[in-house]
Regions:
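Short, low-complexity intrinsically disordered segments enriched in A/P/G/S/L with frequent Arg
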Residues: 2, 12-13, 17
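Intrinsically disordered, low-complexity non-transmembrane regions of multi-pass membrane transporters
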Residues: 23-51, 67-89, 224-254
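Juxtamembrane and boundary regions of transmembrane helices in multi-pass small-molecule transporters
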Residues: 44-68, 130, 134, 139, ...
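Structural signal for alpha-helical transmembrane segments and their membrane-water exit/capping regions
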Residues: 49-89, 111-124, 220, 240-242, ...
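Transmembrane helical segments that form the transport core of multi-pass membrane transport proteins
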Residues: 95, 112, 122-132, 248-326
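Alpha-helical transmembrane segments in multi-pass membrane proteins
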Residues: 108, 112, 116, 139, ...
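Alpha-helical transmembrane segments of multipass membrane proteins
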Residues: 116, 120, 211-219, 273, ...
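Membrane-interfacial helix-loop connectors
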Residues: 147-205, 281-355
């Protein structure tokens, strides 16, 4: 094996040429001699991505959340529950919820599609593979850390996670990025501390780390061997190809592909769940308490349902006021933001179905376990 890797890195290996070609990656017979000159034209692309990401996140996330933190500290509330409109008809519930939901997230959704497409044309693939390309704990951890500035909900993080996967990033790293965005959102943890108490926030942080890393690593194992073997990853890391297409042409094509594969199914799924919330979230009364009979169904409903960023906080605050026990409340705090049926469907073309089912089931289980822990400790 070392001799084979050495001969590959020296160039001219017919086996690796066919291997990389089958994966859709050009092979260079002499990596050292074909390295392009990385001048200003090369470095300005990742710099442009960082500028666009920083401006977009400041406008959509960082500035509004900074101001909302003071509101949460002063009033111990960040607004009314998005489910608190007493709809009884599924059709009216679908329309009413979709309107409120999309008004809350449309800016973040637009930014996510832009960033997910720009990621594929402005960031060199070998950079991404160095950081996130290999399956393992280190790559998964870096994927989770990479998510922290984003502060997106699961559906808005999905297009960026899809963009990462299309650049051949490992399953574990892409999943960690996707799940960590809503679960480990620093702003949400601060809001939760001011509104529900710092015990809830601490439990969410610890359980969130376990959820992000544990679920991602298990799903990585379920996914099996990556499409790119280690030798192919090494070759791509060492090689950088020159694309003859213009930036606008490449970005336009990538943007359309990402939009078409994620947004239509997203809108449809939100409408369906908006109608289904009539049955997913029953009217709360004091008899529900910490009953296990409600803990499990609410964990399942929370895993499937879709909400904007931090909306789980007023939802749980309202439900607890009406009599919901601590256990089911903690289960909702863990499952509602983590993933959702729409976000799972948005990623159907970028992850194996077994991986997505594994993520959904493990998220439900984590929610149930956290509910039991929360009922005992909080």
């Amino acid at each position: 094996m070392p001799d084979e890797i050495g001969s590959r890195r020296a160039g001219a290996s017919g086996y690796n040429s066919r291997l990389l070609s089958s994966c859709g990656i050009p092979f260079m017979s002499n990596l050292a001699s074909t390295q392009p000159n990385r001048g200003w034209a090369f470095w300005c692309k990742p710099l442009l991505f960082l500028i666009i990401a920083a401006i977009g996140l400041y406008y959509v996330k960082w500035s509004p959340y900074y101001l909302k933190a003071f509101v949460a500290a002063d009033s111990h509330s960040i607004g009314a529950s998005i489910l608190n409109d007493q709809q009884s008809s599924p059709w009216s519930a679908a329309l009413a919820y979709s309107q409120v939901y999309f008004l809350a997230i449309w800016k973040a959704a637009v930014l996510a599609v832009i960033l997910g497409s720009l990621l594929q044309v402005l960031i060199p693939r070998d950079w991404l593979l160095r950081l996130f390309g290999r399956a393992g704990f280190g790559s998964t951890l870096r994927g989770g850390l990479f998510a922290l500035p984003g502060m997106m909900c699961s559906c808005c993080a999905a297009p960026v996670a899809a963009g990462l996967r299309r650049q051949k990033v490992s399953v574990g790293a892409a999943l960690a990025f996707w799940i960590a965005n809503p679960v480990l959102n620093p702003a949400t943890l601060v809001f939760m501390g001011f509104v529900l108490g710092w015990g809830f926030s601490a439990l969410r942080l610890v359980a969130g780390i376990v959820l992000v890393l544990g679920v991602s690593l298990v799903a990585q194992r379920v996914a099996g061997p990556e499409q790119l073997p280690e030798a192919a990853v090494d070759a791509v890391v060492e090689a950088s190809t020159v694309n003859e297409q213009s930036f606008l042409s490449r970005w336009g094509k990538t943007l359309w592909q990402l939009f078409w594969s994620t947004i239509p199914i997203y809108v449809l799924a939100v409408l369906v769940l908006g109608a289904a919330r009539v049955w997913l979230f029953p009217h709360i009364d004091g008899a529900m308490g910490d009953s296990l009979w409600w803990l499990v169904p609410l964990a399942i409903a929370g895993t499937l349902f879709v909400i904007p960023t931090a909306a789980e906080i007023p939802i749980v605050q309202t439900m607890m006021t009406l009599g919901l026990g601590t256990g089911p409340a903690v289960a909702l705090l863990m499952t509602l933001p983590s993933i959702s049926l729409p976000s799972l469907l948005m990623l159907r073309k970028d992850f194996d179905a077994r991986v997505l089912v594994t993520v959904a089931v493990l998220t439900m289980l984590v929610g149930i376990v956290c509910g039991l822990i929360g009922a005992a400790l909080l």
